[in-house]
């Protein structure tokens, strides 16, 4: 990204990430590495981050059976290239409100191509003031009091991830496993609900954002195609 000509493709401030399935040997069946989405062949996924300059800067080997969403932030925090990214694109159905909350706290604008977008509900601070036309889209009230009460702990979580003391994927999985009454988990979820609501509204209104996301995801697909072409025997 330091060569002047690299700016022809982008400024290095946006990136996309996606998983690519690779078949493994027979022992993969014993390790339960089979995902029905890819048929009966066992394998792993290489979850790769590619910058807007077509440069891959992070790659993680993850089980084919897990959701990709928790690993988005892991790749961004792996090195300085990812830390300079401001807008991150991903095509995933496994997102969580915790992911939206953590992404915002770490300074990333998360742009996901969400499946079944019309079915997603919005969260507002005062449902009574919501325009009548939008009330059917509102899923509930954002719990501002819970966010304020737990803000120091939320901030410490963000600092812990930034300092590399814990990987974001580990923290997100841990929070997801907590009982619903865990205040920190619920508070970060509330932050995520607010961020997701803002994103959905912006996505619907901003066609330029949709275009940027499509271009970014296409660059990731081009990188996948190159790896497929270079694989020996496509294996």
Regions inferred by a protein language model and the residue ranges of each:
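Short, basic/hydrophobic alpha-helical segments
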Residues: 67-87
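Helix-centered, glycine/charged polyanion-binding patches within enzymatic domains
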Residues: 107-145
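Long, compositionally biased intrinsically disordered regions
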Residues: 136, 143-235
């Amino acid at each position: 990204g330091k060569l002047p000509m690299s700016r022809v493709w982008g400024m290095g401030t946006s990136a996309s990430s996606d998983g690519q399935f690779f078949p493994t040997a027979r022992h993969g069946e014993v390790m339960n590495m089979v995902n029905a989405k890819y048929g009966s062949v066992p394998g792993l996924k290489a979850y790769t981050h590619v910058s807007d300059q077509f440069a891959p800067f992070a790659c993680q080997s993850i089980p084919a059976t897990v959701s990709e969403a928790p690993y988005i932030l892991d790749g961004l925090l792996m090195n300085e290239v990812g830390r300079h990214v401001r807008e991150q694109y991903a095509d995933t159905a496994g997102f969580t409100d915790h992911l939206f909350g953590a992404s915002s706290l770490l300074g990333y604008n998360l742009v996901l191509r969400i499946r079944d977008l019309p079915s997603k509900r919005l969260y507002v601070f005062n449902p009574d003031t919501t325009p009548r036309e939008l009330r059917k889209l509102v899923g509930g009230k954002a719990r501002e009091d819970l966010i304020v009460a737990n803000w120091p702990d939320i901030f410490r979580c963000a600092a812990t991830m930034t300092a590399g003391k814990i990987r974001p994927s580990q923290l997100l999985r841990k929070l997801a496993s907590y009982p619903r009454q865990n205040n920190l988990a619920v508070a970060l979820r509330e932050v995520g609900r607010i961020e997701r609501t803002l994103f959905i509204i912006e996505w619907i209104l901003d066609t330029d954002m949709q275009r940027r996301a499509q271009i970014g995801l296409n660059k990731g697909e081009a990188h996948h195609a190159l790896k497929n072409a270079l694989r020996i025997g496509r294996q």
